[in-house]
UniProtKB/Swiss-Prot annotation:
GO CC annotation terms, alphabetical: cytosol; Golgi apparatus; membrane
The protein's name in its UniProt record: Vacuolar protein sorting/targeting protein 10
Job of this protein: Functions as a sorting receptor in the Golgi compartment required for the intracellular sorting and delivery of soluble vacuolar proteins, like carboxypeptidase Y (CPY) and proteinase A. Executes multiple rounds of sorting by cycling between the late Golgi and a prevacuolar endosome-like compartment.
Topological domain spans for side Cytoplasmic: 1407-1440
Keyword annotations from UniProtKB, A to Z: Glycoprotein, Golgi apparatus, Membrane, Protein transport, Receptor, Repeat, Signal, Transmembrane, Transmembrane helix, Transport
Sequence ranges of the BNR repeats: 62-72, 105-115, 450-461, 494-502, 749-759, 1136-1146, 1179-1189
The family this protein is said to belong to: Belongs to the VPS10-related sortilin family.
Superkingdom of origin organism: Eukaryota
Main location (coarse class): Golgi
Record-annotated membrane-spanning stretches: 1386-1406, 1441-1461
Amino acid sequence: MRVRGALQAAALLASALWAAPLLAKDHPTFKTTKLDTQPNNLNYFEGSDTILFHDTHKSNLWRSDDAGATWSVVKDIPDGKVARLYMHDFDSKRAFAITDGRKHYRTTDQGKTWKTFEVDAAWDTERFDILHFHATDPDRIIFNGLHCLGFLCEEVSLYTIDDFETPAKPLRPDTLGCWWAKSSPVFTTGDSDLDKDRILCIIMGVDSIFSEDRRLVISDDFFKADKEGNIQEFEPNLAGDKPVRGVVNVAAVKRYFMVATTSANTDEMALFISTDTKKWQRAMFPNAHDDHDHKIVQEAYTVLESTNYSIQLNVMTGSKSAPMGIMFTSNYDGTYFSENLEYTNLNMFGHVDFEKIAGIQGIFLVNKVDNGKEVDEKPSTKKKLVSEITFDDGRTFDKVTADGKRIHLHSVTELNNVGRVFSSPAPGLVMANGNTGDYLGDYWEDANLYVSDDAGKTWKKALKGPHKYEFGDQGSILVAVRDSKEEDISEISYSLDHGENWVDEKLPDDLKIQPWILTTTPDSTGLQFVLIGKAKGAWHVIHIDFEGLHEATCKESDMEEWHARVDKDGEPTCIMGHTQTYPRRKKDAKCFLKKEFKLAEVETKDCDCTDQDYECDYNFERNDKGICVSRGPIPIPEGACKEGDRNGKFLGTSGYRKIPGNTCKDTKETKDKYKDVERSCGDGIGAPPDEATGELQQVDTKGKFGHWTHWEKHYLERGESSSDSSETIIMRGMNRTVDDSGPKVGPIWRTTDHGKKWDKVDFFKDDEVISIVPHPTVKDWVFFLTEGKKLIYTPDRGKRFRTFEVPQPADFEAAANGIFPLIFHPDKPNWLIWLGKKCESKNDCYRVAYGTKDGERWETLARDVYRCEFTGAEAYGRKYANRALEQILCLKHEKEGDNDSALQLVSSNDWFNQDERVRLKEAKEFATMAEFIVVATEDTEKKTLRAYASLDGSLYSEAKFPFGFEVPHQHAYTVLDSSTHAVNLFVATRMEGDKSLGTILKSNSNGTSYVVSVKNVNCDQYFYVDFEKMVGLEGVALVNVVVNPDAKSSAPKKLQTKITHNDGAQWAYLPTPRKDEFGKFPCSSSGTEKCALHIQGYTQRRDRGKTYSSEGAVGVMFGWGNVGDSLGSIKDADTFMTTDAGITWKRVKKGRWNWALGDQGSIIVLVPIRGQKTDTLEYSLDQGATWKKHTFSKEKVDIWDLTTTRSGNSQNFLIWGENSDGLFTTKIDFTKFTDHVCKYDPENLSKSDYQIFSPKHPLQPDGCLFGHVSQYLRKKPGLKCFNDFRLDPLYSKQNCTCTRSDFECDFNYELDKHGQCSLVSGLKPKDHKLWCKEHPDEIEYYEPTGFRRIPLTTCQGGLDFEKAAAVHPCPGHEDDFERKHRVSGIAIFFAVVLPVAAASAIGWWVYRHWDGKFGQIRLGEQGASTMEFFDADRPWVKYPVIALSAVVALAGAMPLVLGALWRTAKSTAERWGIGGGGGGRGGWSRLDGGGASRTFRTRDSFARGRGDYTIVDEDEGELLGEESDEEV
C-alpha cells in the first residue's frame, strides 16, 4: 500500500537507535528510529526514496532521503512553524509547508532546501484544497485562503505564475474557491492558450451569502478589470443555453470537469459536466424505480476512481445511520449515467467499498449489502455484506472465491493502512483481509489474509489473522505484518513467490509493537519498506531493506508473459474489448527486477466486438430475458426534433451502448444489431410540449374528500436543482367545532401533479398524526408527529416513508403555546433537536433537549430547557468565524430542577459535548432573523426589557436606542423581516389591547445601534405589526401608522399607509390610482396626508398566510384598501395592484378578491373571497392590463382558497372550495396556452422575450438606491411563451458613487431642521475608540461626524460622510498609523490646492443636488411632500443657496464635504503612485416578556402565530368556521 493522505496523530521527538544489521544474505536488514510522538502525513516524493512527514505536535517537518533509514528535522524552516504539509500534485520535486502566519515555505529539490514565500491571506483550516496546482505548469498555483477582521472572515483566492517568486496576486472579490481549468493532465479545453490561463471560480451571489445564490465565473486573464472597473469574466451556460445559480462545488475528474449546484427548497443537487469548460450538460440519471431513488443529494454522492473514458459515481440512498448506495457509470461524454449496482456499502463519511485493480482495465472489487431492502426499511437492521468482482467495468459481477468457497473482503470503509486497499502497480497481484462464509465477518475475529496473482479471479489463503500488507519489486516481494490492538507483534512475514510460501522475520532487539502503517514507494518497484508502530509510549519507524536477499537481477528467462484474463486453455481472452499482457517475474524465479521507479508496460490487442462488449444504454434496463428494455425517455441528439414537433422522428439509441472505454473492433453483425433506430420525438428527453390549444384546462376532484370545516395543506415545492418536475401537495380535511364532536382530522392525501390526481396515503392508516411538519428550508422532507414516541418522515416528498422513535413524548401543552418539540437545522435536514417531556413523577416533569444527526441515535443536549434552536449555518459559518455549523442556542433554567428559576441563554458549538457557555442571564426570549440573533433580557430592578444582538452567537452587545426613546416597562419586541443587513425592530410603546402601537427602529450593520425609522406603527394586542416587505426587492416595505395616537380611549384608531423604497430611511404616502371603469375615487393626489391610497395591513387580514407579493413576480404587489384620508373598513375595501414596486397603483376589482401569481408573474388569477359564492374566476396574461373570465363550475360554489406555488413559477393553480357534495378541488391549468419557451438573449435583450425593470425611488431621480442601480428581468407583458426555468430576476447591479443618500444619522444624532445630523442636546458622541477594541486589527479610528453608512448601501468612492473628520491611531498602532499617513510633497499639494479649487464647484454642487442629496435620507415620519418648502425652485431657496455656496463650502462643509473629497483625492493619488497610503428570507420573530415563546422563522409560521408549524391550517382567523366579515 502507498501513502496517499494524512495519518492521524500526535507528536514527535527523536533519538535514533540503530539495530545491528543481520549478517545472513537471505535476511532483510532493519534500522529503527525511535520517536516520542506519532509521525503524521508521511509522503514520498514520487520516483525517489525521499520521504517527508509532519510532526503535528511540535509543528516541524522531518525528512529522509534513504527510504526511511535515517531521519532529520528540516532546518530551513524555523522550529514550530509548520501547520500543514502539501505535496505538489504534478511535480515530484516540490512541496509546501504552510504556517499559521502569512510567511510559508517551499522546496523545489525534494526538501533539501526550503525558501520562504508570503501570501496576503491566512490559510483556511476547513479547506483541503488550499493550494490548487496547474497540471502542466508547476509554477502556476492558486492559494485559497481567508481575510479575517475580528470574527468576520471572507474567503480570498490569489494566484502565482512563478511559484511564489513574486508576491501572489488576488483574483477577484467574493470568491469561494478557484481552480485552474487544466487541473488534470488529460483534460484540455482544446486551446493551448486557454489551457494555460483559464481559471474557474465560485463567487458569492449578489448581496447574498447563501449557497443557492452562488455562481460560477470563468476568466482567461486572471479576472483583470478594464478601465471602467468591469471584471473580465463570463458566466458559463451550465444548463445548455443559460447560467445556473447555486454552485457549491467544482471538481476535475480525469478529462471531465464537474460542477455541483444546489437550490432552495431541496437537498437534491444537480451535476453539470464538461469536457472542455465551454459546453456543459446536466448529468442525467435513469428514472427511479423499485425501492430506491436516483437523485443526487447533498453530501450523499461520491466520485469514485474514474477513467479517461467515463465517470463512476456512487449515490447514497439509505439512511445516514445505515448508508447504502447505487453505483453509476457514465457514457463517454460524462452526461448520461447507467446503473451498475445497487445497495453498495458505504460509511457515514461517504467512503465506498469500491476499488479498481491497479493498472488493469475494467476490474474492480465492491462490497454490497445483501439485505439492502430490509436495511432501507429499518435502518437499525445489521448490514449483511458480500464481496463481488467485475471484469467488464461493472456490466456484470461475479462472486469472489478461494478454493471453491466464497470469500468476503474488508474494504475502504474499514481502512487499516494507508494507500490502496487491495492492489498495487504490481501486475495481477492482489491481497486482502477477509473470511469465508455467507457474509463479511468481524475484522479482528474472523479475518485472514488472502492473495490472488490473477487480478482477483482466484484467491488462496496466505496467513491466519488480519494483516497490514505491501508489495515490492513489482510483486516479487509481498510483505505483511499481523495487525493487533495490543503491543504484541514481534515479527513480519514475507513471500517471494506470490504468496505460496511465507517466511517470518523477527523485529530487531526483541521489539514488540502495535503496528500502525506499513508502506513503500507509491509505484511498488523498490526493495525497501517502512513499518511504523507503537511500543511502550514511543513510536518506532522501522526501515526494512530486502536488497541483500537476491543479488541476482532477473534475466529474460526469469520473466513470463502474464495475461490479465485467460480461458481454460490458458489463452488470453478479452477484457474491455482487448487482451492485456504484462511482463512479470516468474513465481519461482530467484531474482529481483531491481527496476526502481519503472512500471511494467502493458501490451494490448483489440478483439472483435461481441454481445459482452455492450451494456444497456441510459434509461434502459435488462429484463428477465437479458434484453435491454426502456425505463424512461431517450436522449434526443442535438439538432433533432424541431420545436413543437412531437410527431417528428429521430435516430436514437437501440437501447444498447458499447461499454465506455471498450476498444473492441466493430463487426458487421454488431453494427447491424446495435445501430441507432428511428424514434418518435414525443418519446425523447426534453420532448416538445403538446401543441398549444390556447385554452384553459381544468380538472375537478369532487365528492372524494367528505365534509370538513377546514383544509390543512402543504405545498412541497421543489428546487431548481430538483431532477423531476412534479408539483407535490400534501393535505387533509379538518374539523374545528365548538363541542369537539366528531373526527378532528381526515385521511392524508397526496398529489404530484398539482391536484390533477389525489392519492390517499395508506402508510398512516394505523397512526393518528397530530401534526404535519414540512422542513422549513428543505421541502423534500416532511415530518408527521404522533401522540407517542413514534415519528414518521419522508425524505422525498412522500415517495417513501420511514419511522424512528424519539426519546420522550412531546410536550403538547407547550406546543400549544408556541414551543414546538421538533427543531430543524437550516442546512442539514437530518440534524434534529427534539424537546421531550420527561417526568420523574406525575407532578415532576421537565423539558429535555435531545439531538440527533440521523434520527437513530439521540444524545441528551440539555435538561430543564425552555427551548432551543440551531443558529449555525453553512452561509454564516463562512462569514463569522465563531458561528460553527453545529451552533445551538438554548434558553435554559438557571437552577436545575427548578422550572421557576430565571432563564439564561446558553450556547454550544459541538452539540453540548464539551462546549457549553452561558451568554446572557435573565434572558426572556431570543429570535433569529437573517444573520442576526436578537435577545430580550429582563432588567429585574426596573422590570423592563433590554435587547441584545449578535452576529456570531458568541459576542452579544446591548442594543443602544436613540436618545429620548424611553419606554417605561417595555414588555414586547417584534423582530421584523431583516434581510437587508440591518435589524428592523418593533418596540411596543403603548400596550393597551386594541390601542397598542409602537416604533420601528432600524439598526446598524451589527444590530446594536438603533435609530428611529417610523413611529406610531399599528399592531394588535399580540404585537403582530402592520409591516409588509415586497418580496424580491430590497428595501421596499409598507406600514400602517396610527395618526391619532393621542385620541381618547373610546376613539377608534385612524390608520394611514406609508411606503419606503430605501429600507425605512424615508416614508411616503401611496399615490391614488387614476379614475377607472369602476368609478371615481373620493379624491386624487400623488399621496398626501389628506388623500392617499391605504392598504389593509397584516393585523386586519383574516388569512395571514397570504402575502402581498410573490417571489417570482418582481415589483408586483396586491392589496385590499381604499382611497381617502385614512384606512376604511375592510368590508368596504377594493382590490388594488402595482407592477412598479408601489410607485403607481390601479384598482383591478371592486370588493375583495383573492389573488395568485404564476409563471413568474405573467399569469394572475383572481377569485372572490370566501362567503361570496361564484362559478367564475378572472385571469390576466399581461400584468393586469386586461382581464378575462373563465367559468369553472356548473353551480355557484364557496371558494375557500386559491393557491399556487409560493415561488410563483408554476402555470397551475388550485381552487379549494365547498359545494353541495362537500369539499372539492379544481386544478386550473394554463400550460396549453402556449408551447413556446420564452427566449432569453443576455447579449441582445431587444431580441429577448424579457425586458428590464429598474425600481425607482420617487424622490431620487438618478435611480441610485442603496448605492447602486439594480435592473431586473421580467417577461414582456402579453407574450405567449412560458418560463421553463426559474429566471434570476436580478439582471445587473452597478454601483454608484457615494452621496449623502448613502448615509444616515449615527447613534445619539438626529436630523435637524436643515436636514443635517446634529448631536442631540446634552449628549456626547459615541466613543469611536471602541472601534479599536471591537476591531483589534484596525490601526486607526475617525472622530464621529454624526453620520453612518447605511448598512445596505454598496456605493463606492465619492463622498464619505462617515470618515470626514479627523483620524487618530488606535492604541498600540501608532507606528503603523504613522507609516500609513506619511505624506509626500505632491500629496501636500493636493491637500492644499484641491479644497480651494473645489469650493466654487461645491457651491454649484450644493445647489444642483439640494433635492436629492441633502436632507432626504431621514429616519422619521416625513412623507413625499415634506421637503417641498425647501424645493430648489422656490425663490427664497434658489438665490440664497447660490449666494451662500462659497461660505457653505469653506465653512460649513469644509470639515465634512471636503474631508470626504480629500479622501477621494488621496485614494486617486495613491492609485497614481502619489503619497504614502497603504428579497426577504425570513418572517418575523417576537420577543415577548410575558413568557410565551414565539419562534417565527418563516412568514407562514408568523401568519399562523404558532411557530414553525401547527396542528391547524394557516387560516387562523376562522377558528370556529364562521364566515363573518367582522372576523379579521
